[in-house]
Amino acid sequence: LWDQCSWIIETVSEKLELKQAIFKHLDESVPTTIPIGSNSSGFPISKIALGLKTAQRMMGAHYFMPAEVVPLVEIVLGEKTDPAIAQQVCQLYREVNKKPVLVKKDIPGFLANRIQHALMREALSLVEEGIASPEDIDDAVRYSFGFRYAAVGPMTQKEISGWDGMANAAKEI
C-alpha cells in the first residue's frame, strides 16, 4: 500500500479537533518516510501536529480555489517541520505543474491570504471614506496592477521600476 505513496494531504473541513485526530492516526500508521500535509486555510500546522512523534514531516499545504486551475500551493513550515522534507514536497508539486512557495514561519493567514487581506482592507477603507465606488476600485485593480501582477509579482515589479522611486512615492501615501 505505502510503496506507491510519496505524500499524504488531509483536506477535511476546518475543525481543529478533526484535523488533530486525523494527524494522530497518520502519525501512528503511516511510514515515517512519507511527508504529511494539511490543506488548512487557517489553523497553524504546529497546532494540528502538536505533540505528535513525527511532527518534523508535517507541514501545511494550502491550495487556492479552484485548485485545479490556480497553480499556487503554499508549503507552510511548522515549528518542528524539517525544511529538507518541505523542499522534497515542493519538488513533488513542481512535477505536477503546481507552483509551490515556501512559507518559512507558521503565521496566521500564511502568505498569499495576508497579501490579499491587506489589499482588501485598503479597498474597503477607500469605499468607507467615499473616495471611490466598489466598481471603480475593482476596475483600478483589474486594469492596472492586477493585470500586471499576473506577469510579475510586486517585488519583481519594484525591482524593474526602481526601489528609490517607490520609497519616495511611499512617503506621500
Predicted segments — roles?
Residues 9-10, 70, 102-104, 151-153:
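Short beta-strands and strand-loop turn motifs
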